[in-house]
Amino acid sequence: MHEHYQPREIENAAQSFWDEQKSFEVSEQPGKETFYCLSMFPYPSGKLHMGHVRNYTIGDVISRYQRMQGKNVLQPMGWDAFGMPAENAAMKNNVAPAKWTYENIAYMKNQLRSLGLAVDWSREVTTCKPDYYRWEQWLFTRLFEKGVIYKKSGTVNWDPIDQTVLANEQVIDGRGWRSGALIEKREIPMYYFKITAYADELLSSLDDLPGWPEQVKTMQRNWIGKSKGMEVQFPYNVDSIGEAGALKVFTTRPDTLMGATYVAVAAEHPLATQAAQNNPELQAFIAECKGGSVAEADVATQEKKGLPTGLFVEHPLTGEKLPVWVANYVLMHYGDGAVMAVPAHDERDFEFATKYSLPIKSVVRTSSGDTNPAPWQDAYGEHGELINSGEFDGLDFQGAFDAIEVALIKKNLGASRTQFRLRDWGISRQRYWGCPIPIIHCESCGDVPVPEDQLPVVLPEDVVPDGAGSPLARMPEFYECSCPKCGQPAKRETDTMDTFVESSWYYARYASPHYEGGLVEKSAADHWLPVDQYIGGIEHAILHLLYARFFHKLMRDEGLVSSNEPFKNLLTQGMVVAETYYRREANGAYTWFNPADVELERDSKAKVISAKLIADGLPVEIGGTEKMAKSKNNGVDPQSMIDQFGADTCRLFMMFASPPDMSAEWSDSGVEGSHRFLKRVWRLAHAHISQGLPGKLDVAALSDEQKLIRRSIHLAIKQASQDVGQNHKFNTAIAQVMTLMNVLEKAPQATEQDRALVQEGLETVTLLLAPITPHISHDLWNRLGHSDAVIDARWPVQDDSALVQDTLQLVIQVNGKLRGQIDMPATASREDVEAAARVNENVLRFTEGLTIRKVIVVPGKLVNIVAS
């Protein structure tokens, strides 16, 4: 055994052992309790960052701990490999996305292996490989035939230069983020998942997830956005519109119906189109609206604009004529593309009516009174008693809701309705590096799904995109085909799927990644699913986690899985943050410097007072801590840390820096401190082992001093078991081990009994650290005399008898002030404790001349003597 801690040597040996033994390859073992632990798989961007290290270390600690509980633990890993960054890198470097992606995977896989993760690499999946996306295409065809996937025209942001659809986030100030072209609104045919058909279940089954953070469930509830309201119809006739019919609106405030003074429709609404036929001004306004954002958030904050159409509808209860306006704050895809405007009680309507001098009629008595003068107050939107509403006066919200519904039903002009904010999920992308949509377009037969025996539709991998639209649309060798139904020449779909589709079912594929008979092997899926512990960033709270829940229900309804939810427990890990350093250039731009290139000056209390760039010795500004990011150049390369200190040090620091759900602040001194701690463990173990291993501890013959040491050992086991097993507070578990190390370093080693006690202490330290620092634990466990590997050892169990104290130290107070301590037998009665306290010399001194009025004894803690 080396006298000094040699992490590289130790880690190479441990990893070689695990590889040779296939230590983490698992299979179904009926009768043995399973535990499926999964961290969100990475996008192969090129290099691991510290966020990855933290995410995968958390998952690994949980996996290794559960294995020590005797469970059959599955921890797989794969690659979320399709997506835009590969196309961008391909254009920049003139290389095919496939080549770039596979090279990145090879490099990052080596990095992950060097962290010592207990991963079953035999189950690795790569989403850009045909053997993976074949099953995605198979499921697509099944769902298309069932109508769960359908095709319709949708309004999108179209980049006329790049010839592609952009997400709302990719439109900056009305221009394409890459081309700079003015974005057009276009209606293009796209494929949609009917996620709205599952909205109710997606909402209600959140209640079946007690192991999910409340914050994530709230975010999903808000995103799904269930609202109970009423569908109201405003009739019109030949005189007012040119034909008879009714304008449908959805409202969550039917109690305010008597306060409606106009109706507003979206630019795409049929009434707007009709009114614009002979109205050039309205045509121009509609075109302007269609060029605006389709994002709800943008619509909410933009200036409200509108034009009257000259059309009128009737109020359903009063028959009053209400003008129809086209307004830019009404979205065609929400509700029915029309709103009944009640300016007195809705802020957007109020703003619009004030701007265009439309009537404002108060119909609810709110805390601000019976009238609603400008400017808008939040109180105007409150529920309250109805006023100025005829027969409905005096009713509260629910009473008015019910009474107005009855009145509308009588006239056949309305009824209550539940609506969701959630929209169907459009998955068509005019991109190359994605999963091809398995549809063939035939002039005679329409859209025909690719038959199962012709799957997968393979994406050609030798393509270098140029950014102008989809390369597949310019490749006849890809899209020219025959119709599977009639045999006529046909054209293959050239859009690819949204990359969120691949990550919506990967967790299920891990159960049987090499199965060729279907998307999953049912018996394997039932054995492993649902995932017991899922780990990933809170930024995935809505989209990925909602889509994965949706997909699980789709797979259940296809008979592929038996459970209702994919992830039993969810841990959202915090970000890794680090200091930022910058200089402001003459033109106002910021230049950011990496912490490794900066030298800090500290005061006598170690507080940083200034920073300078090592390269030129000139000062730099300190910008505060922010999430590690390329944009701020404050990332730390995990590989350099592993090379310098070893993987165990990196893992220990990451777990010690903060609880997993909080942000962890990177600190060089913290890393060095973690390294020093592992050196201390090694040093103590070396000193102990070099004297030869002791015999068995005789617990019955322990001295009082030895009992205290053994109590520290079992107290550490008790606390760490709670911290790791129940609370995922790895930082406090590590603190327990550090406290135990302080005790063991001071423990005497004079007798065989002393050394046997240190042996028990070192074995405990090794086992408690095994999930966190697996390499050093692997080495020490064998050196401490065990023939089995530490990964096969059981988590230590506390000896409750060791925690029992023969004597207790009690605090003595006089009138609430600390005046001393007394040692008492743990079995002492309240009377014995009080008697001992009364004769304590400090008590006698501080109660001299006073009368003792009361003695309060808190068993095992303190005695308070009240005297006056």
Curated annotation (Swiss-Prot):
Chain span(s) of sequence motif 'KMSKS' region: 627-631
Catalytic activity of the protein: tRNA(Leu) + L-leucine + ATP = L-leucyl-tRNA(Leu) + AMP + diphosphate
GO cellular component: cytosol
E.C. no: 6.1.1.4
Cross-referenced SUPFAM superfamilies: Anticodon-binding domain of a subclass of class I aminoacyl-tRNA synthetases (SSF47323), Nucleotidylyl transferase (SSF52374), ValRS/IleRS/LeuRS editing domain (SSF50677)
A biological-process GO annotation: leucyl-tRNA aminoacylation
Gene3D superfamilies to which the protein is assigned, alphabetical: 2.20.28.290, 3.10.20.590, HUPs, Isoleucyl-tRNA Synthetase, Domain 1
Protein name as catalogued: Leucine--tRNA ligase
Organism of derivation: Pseudomonas fluorescens (strain SBW25)
